[in-house]
Curated annotation (Swiss-Prot):
Residues given in the record as FAD binding sites: 8-12, 33, 43, 80, 111-114, 149, 177, 295-305, 322-324, 450
Protein name per UniProt: NADH oxidase
Domain of life (superkingdom): Bacteria
Originating gene: nox
Provenance organism: Mycoplasma pneumoniae (strain ATCC 29342 / M129 / Subtype 1)
Co-factor binding details: Binds 1 FAD per subunit.
Length: 479
């Protein structure tokens, strides 16, 4: 019986263990996680804060007990602090006692995920990660300075937003998906909200300005104070350095009763030796093949937020820390360990979606800006159209954008925005087209249906393709 050690038991680790032990009884699994719970869906934190999710416990889909019942040995509140590849052993620290022990493996699975980037309290931005402690409610024990990832963070935010009457103003550092969702939740809870980011537009890493302009407009209409293009210099604290009082930026001070850091994440790979031919990506994630084996290390699998996977759009290894990628990577790694080569994760394209301030947004592949940065000869096609025939009497506006390589006509990415009816699932088949490196001419000939209840003969995707190919006879109506 082969012994497998799994480092990390959240989305990727849970998926791996469930798949492996449901398909085979030939493995002994020892799993370590430094948290006290597993499988928490952090995407639901803002929903719980705003009251959409009534019971925070519903955001869990597995437990250590379930994995133990399947045959795994699961050790919670245990941190892997060292790795010896020659001896095939890990050094594990019990966070409750501080005691360190050694465990040996035949095959290793790194599912250690990523941790929020935290900024230094007093100095300029350092991007230094604070030491993990699952019992800490706040960043660096500074009251009301918090990150957003864990169940523990969710409980703190729920208390701060919905029960703590002293919290009247909230500053959010970062305008990515987490920051924007929390901004909406804080606004729904009646807080004064300021969003601070070095980017010029909210969600500027995920969408181009035709979409971020609409998001900015909706946020300002809701009364959100946007400080875009602003660099954080540090956090303002009380005299005893126990309570945060605001944020210092290069454009002035922002007073706040609660400050949330949602800058981004950094992979937890610090325990992996840097001198043993692992190929690290620029942010510390580890490059893997289509079976999630670390390059140059066939008995080490890296899954979830610690992995850098081939991106079919950029044609580079990318670390895209999404639960969808984590779950799929865990499944593929488990199937390969069992002996199957039929299931493989050949590529990702960063497909994502956002629903805030009445807008439905979705994207896949490269933005126009990123495509240009990657050296493509970029072409774009943007249409504003109604989602179904005007003769139906009721219809909603949709904005759709294609990004492609003008030299080859290869599809590089797409973005979608709808104001009322949600059409974000259209991005699913566009994602497949980007993954398979289809040409926009091929995309235009995909056999899709027409039914006036739902769409047009020349739907907004086809309209964008026709426009890109130079067919000027079709002009979208926009009412």
């Amino acid at each position: 019986m082969k012994k497998v050690i799994v480092i990390g038991v959240n989305h990727a680790g849970t998926s791996f263990i469930r798949t492996l032990l449901s398909k085979s009884k030939d493995f002994q699994v020892n799993a370590y996680d430094r948290n006290t719970n597993i499988s928490f869906l952090g995407c639901g934190i803002a929903l719980a804060v705003s009251g959409v999710v009534k019971n925070t416990e519903d955001l869990f889909y597995s437990t250590p007990e379930e994995l133990k019942a399947m045959g795994a040995n699961v050790f919670m509140a245990h941190d892997v602090v060292g790795l010896d590849l020659d001896k095939k052993q890990v050094i594990v620290k019990d966070l409750a006692t501080g005691k360190e022990t050694v465990d040996h493996y035949d095959q290793l699975v790194v599912a250690s995920g990523a941790w929020p980037i935290c900024m230094n309290v007093e100095n300029e931005v350092t991007h230094t990660q604070l030491q993990f402690n699952h019992t800490d409610k706040y960043c660096g024990n500074i009251k009301n300075l918090i990150s957003c990832k864990l169940y523990q963070h969710a409980l703190t935010l729920i208390d701060s937003f919905r029960h703590d009457k002293s919290i009247k103003s909230v500053a959010i550092v970062g305008s990515g998906y987490i920051g924007l969702e929390l901004a909406e939740a804080a606004w729904q809870c009646g807080k004064q909200v300021t969003v601070i980011d070095m980017l010029d537009k909210p969600a500027g890493n995920n969408f181009d300005e035709e979409f971020t302009n609409e998001l900015e407009k909706a946020m300002k209409k809701a009364g959100i104070n946007l400080m875009m293009g602003s660099a954080v210099k540090g956090f303002i604290v009380d005299a005893d350095k126990n309570v945060v009082k605001g944020v210092e930026t290069d454009k002035g001070r922002v007073d706040a009763d609660l400050v949330i850091q949602s800058i981004g994440f950094r992979p937890n790979t610090q325990f992996v030796p840097k001198d043993r031919q692992f190929e690290f990506n620029r942010n510390g994630s580890i490059k893997v093949n289509e079976y999630l084996q670390a390059l140059n290390h066939e008995n080490v699998y890296v899954i979830g937020g610690a992995a850098a996977i081939y991106d079919a759009a950029s044609e580079q290894y990318e670390n895209i820390d999404l639960a969808t990628n984590a779950v799929k990577s865990g499944l593929v790694a488990a199937m390969h360990m069992i002996g199957s080569k039929a299931v493989k994760l050949e590529s990702i394209v960063g497909t994502n979606a956002l629903h805030v301030f009445g807008l439905n947004l979705a994207a896949t592949g490269l933005t126009e800006k990123r495509a240009k940065m990657n050296g493509f000869d970029v072409g774009v096609s943007i249409v504003d159209d109604n989602d179904r025939p005007e003769f139906m009497g009721t219809f909603d506006k949709v904005r759709f954008k294609l990004i492609y390589d003008k030299k080859t006509l290869r599809l590089l990415g797409a973005q979608l925005l709808s104001w009322n009816t949600n059409h974000s699932e259209i991005i699913f088949y566009i994602a497949l087209a980007v993954q398979k490196k289809m040409l926009i001419s091929e995309l235009g000939l995909v056999d899709v249906y027409f039914l006036p209840h739902y769409n047009k003969p020349f739907n907004f995707v086809l309209a964008a393709v026709l426009q890109a190919l130079g067919f000027s006879y079709y002009t979208p109506k926009n009412k």
